[in-house]
Design a protein with these regions (language model features):
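Terminal presequence/propeptide segments associated with secretion/organelle targeting
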Residues: 2, 18-713
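Bacterial N-terminal signal peptides that target proteins for export
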Residues: 1-8
Length: 713
């Protein structure tokens, strides 16, 4: 009986451990014995060299940094690249029109000749890594001020980048880790000819939209397919009709086996930013000031977007990508503030700081080294809290609020040249160089929408920000109009050249000072206020305290396997497929199915409409080889992996190195995860590869793509 009880306890303990989320965004080149042991315990069958190597093809060679904000992966020998729909949305939107509505209807290139080039899109392949901490910190002393320290680090880093780059056409970056306690050099090959191959209809790729965003259960086919092209010799190149599809050094086979609870999962990608070693003051600032300010401004903007997008299909196409961009982190901050409170992250940070104090004062040398860092934190946040709200409103409701105001920023250099009386040739060169960006701006610009957005945001700005921190123009006009900027904005839009493409182009042909243009003047007044507030806010720094606190935590917890905060460098996270129990008596299954898609279906609804072709396949239960053992078509699944923004589009890889999913989101219960990892409830939301293949094969009948893929059964 005792033996059976012990065995049961062990089994339950193992189940509990497996159900916990697996914390850590690890640098893949430095995976150590503890990480490998954990990975093998979870089921990984790959060696470290098979995962990451500069000596042989490895998983690393299939992973790209996509478009400066996402991740993608190669899935064919000819450079076929998979990422998320929301990562590719702006490029799809740029090709869309009312006549060719690729947003609503999707896009499928039936041959390489039909693939669409994308100006400004590039992908990066990692080719070299080196720890350069000693070189970067050469000549840096403890007696230096932070300003002197930063200048020396910048000088050393610039020299190293130049040396490493040489005459090669590569991108070299030196990135700080652990709050400046370590510096690593990365070298990338940049490929600038990346063409759109396929994207699903809106009712698949954007299914659930804002309502479902950041939540589980989910039912979204969040994918987009591109292709990387190279020069004929295989080197990176700008777009050219003579370019050829990339010959992939490594690509990911796609598994049809599906997922079960406990299955090993690994994700390689480029997580953007976390702050898991921050002080309690940073957490309180987000809860009380930063989060609410961003949500308030973006709520106001989104209300105007929806009003105009719902009224006009052409405006919907113009603003679909913009709306998605604004709403993504609008909902993120709503969830983050809620879960930081719910999960008592501020209280946990206070407790950690008390542990640090107790450890610090237990040793004379430690006390001397770390003394004063908490006073520095307190001083910084007491100062910063006076400026956080004003700076956020200045950005979100000011120079990045209305589009015309943001557009005016582009004319600063040219206007400065005019006012400083540059030569006619210099002015002409600058003016003509702006014409392509003018065309690009007005392609997706709606004056009526922007006018309403600008009015609403300036009304909010004036109402919510302390009068002495308002830009002088907004203060003056708000006082005069009792906070109603309707007449002011209407007048500005009537008189400014910056809301009319023909007038802007005519001005570029004969440019004169824009200083009296009402929108340019508004932009400059807002920007000047931002500079003043920023300068005042930056008079107090916490860089030294952050660096020493990080060093001290690592010294205090010597047995802990620390990983660095995310900073848009390649990382590896490992875990497993698991259910989620977010609260008492609530359990979420690890998968969702096409039945769930249809249960949410709302004909004509912008969030929950479903393409007719998909409905027909569901009605006929025509899933083919993509059904699971129960005959269902799995759409999404969840894992215990540790990801954040930037990981969008990352591959979910099984124990054998096959692609089983596409990571695209995190869950609501763990929205505090960028600040504090939530062991019990943190989940990564993934699209099942069987759903991807089903859409390509059965719905789109894109057999040209199916023939390129390596499918493992």
């Amino acid at each position: 009986m005792t033996k059976k009880t012990n065995l049961l306890c062990i089994a339950l303990m193992m189940l509990f451990l497996c159900a916990r989320a697996d914390e850590g965004m690890w640098l893949p080149y430095s995976i150590n014995g503890q990480n490998l042991a954990d990975m093998q315990r979870l089921g990984c069958k790959l060696t470290a060299e098979q995962i990451f190597s500069f000596n042989q093809p490895s998983l690393k060679d299939a992973i790209v940094q996509f478009g400066g904000g996402c991740t993608g992966e190669l899935i064919s020998p000819e450079g076929l690249l998979l990422t998320n729909h929301h990562c590719g949305l702006s490029y799809v939107q740029a090709h869309a029109s009312v006549e060719h509505d690729y947003l609503q209807d999707g896009f499928w290139a039936r041959s390489k000749a039909e693939e669409l080039p994308n100006e400004g899109l590039s992908v990066l392949f990692l080719t070299y890594i080196e720890d350069v901490t000693a070189s970067v910190l050469n000549g840096v002393t403890d007696k230096m001020s932070e300003k002197e320290r930063d200048a020396k680090i910048a000088e050393n880093s610039k020299k190293l980048r130049i040396e490493k780059k040489g005459k090669r056409d590569v991108r070299v970056e030196i990135v700080p880790f652990y709050h400046g306690n370590q510096y690593i050099l990365f070298v990338y090959d940049e490929y600038k000819d990346v063409r759109l191959v396929a994207c699903p209809p809106w009712g698949i790729g954007k299914y659930g939209a804002d309502t479902d965003n950041w939540t589980w259960p989910r039912h979204k086919g969040d994918f987009c397919i591109f292709r990387v092209y190279t020069a004929p010799d295989g080197s990176p190149a700008e777009y050219s009709k003579d370019n050829i599809p990339m010959k992939s050094k490594h690509y990911l086979p796609i598994s049809l086996k599906g997922v079960q609870p406990g299955d090993y999962t690994m994700i390689l990608g480029y997580p953007g930013s976390t702050d898991r070693y921050s002080s309690s003051g940073a957490v309180k600032n987000i809860i009380d000031l930063e989060g609410p300010a961003i949500v308030s401004c973006r709520t106001t903007k989104l209300e105007q977007y929806r009003k105009h997008m719902d009224a006009d299909p052409a405006v919907f196409i113009q603003y679909a990508s913009k709306q998605a961009s604004v709403s993504n982190y609008w909902k993120y901050y709503i969830g983050q503030v809620k879960q930081l409170k719910q999960n008592k992250v501020y209280e946990k940070r206070l407790a950690q700081e008390q542990d640090f104090r107790d450890w610090m004062i237990g040793n004379v040398e430690r006390a001397a080294k770390y003394k004063g860092i908490f006073d520095e934190f307190d001083n910084y946040w007491n100062h910063q809290n006076q400026y956080t709200k004003a700076l956020i409103y200045n950005r979100e409701a000011g120079w990045r609020g209305g589009e015309a105001v943001t557009f005016a920023l582009r004319f600063r250099q040219l206007n400065a040249a005019i006012e400083k009386k540059a030569t006619p040739d210099q002015i002409k060169k600058l003016a003509q160089g702006m014409k392509p960006s003018v065309k690009d701006f007005f392609k997706d610009y709606n004056k009526a929408l922007d006018r309403d957005v600008t009015i609403a945001l300036l009304n909010l700005y004036y109402k919510d920000v302390n009068p002495d921190q308002l830009p002088t123009m907004i203060k003056k006009e708000g006082d005069k109009s009792h906070g109603d900027f309707t007449a002011f904005v209407n007048n500005a839009f009537a008189k400014s050249i910056l809301v009319d493409e023909n007038k802007v182009n005519a001005w570029l042909d004969n440019p004169k000072s824009l200083s009296k243009d009402p929108i340019f003047a508004l932009m400059y007044n807002i920007l000047e206020s931002y500079w003043v507030l920023s300068e005042q806010a930056e008079t107090v720094s916490k860089d030294r305290a952050d660096r020493l606190y990080m060093e001290g935590l690592m010294e205090m917890q010597k047995d802990r396997n620390f990983y660095p905060d995310a900073n848009f460098t390649m990382r590896l996270t490992y875990g497993s497929v698991q259910d989620c129990e977010p609260r008492d008596a609530v359990t979420y299954s690890y998968i969702t199915t096409l039945d769930g898609v249809m249960a949410k279906y709302k004909p004509g609804d912008w969030e929950f409409d479903v393409p007719k072709d998909l409905i027909k396949l569901w009605e006929n239960h025509d899933y083919g080889q993509y059904a699971d053992k129960n005959g269902d078509l799995v759409v999404n699944f969840i894992t215990t992996n540790d990801i954040t923004g930037g990981n969008s589009g990352s591959p979910v890889i099984d124990a054998n190195g096959n692609l089983i999913g596409l990571a695209f989101d995190g869950n609501w219960e763990a929205m505090s995860g960028d600040i504090s990892f939530e062991q019990q409830v943190q989940r990564t939301i993934c699209m099942d590869m069987r759903y991807l293949l089903f859409i390509i094969d059965k719905m789109a009948n894109a057999q040209n793509l199916m023939q390129e893929l390596t499918i493992v059964k």
